[in-house]
């Protein structure tokens, strides 16, 4: 994470990143399906 961070904020940031990646993956699949 960022320079000033403890374990708690690191875990929170990691979970946010995973949620964002999951959202983008689903969005990409949806777009690919709609384009066909």
Curated annotation (Swiss-Prot):
The keyword rRNA-binding does not apply. One of its GO terms (biological process) is neuropeptide signaling pathway. Keywords: Amidation, Hormone, Neuropeptide. The modification Lysine amide is found at residue 36. One of its GO terms (molecular function) is hormone activity. The keyword Zinc does not apply. Supra, subesophageal ganglia and segmental ganglia of the ventral nerve cord and brain. It comes from the Eukaryota. May be involved in leech reproduction. This is Egg-laying-like hormone.
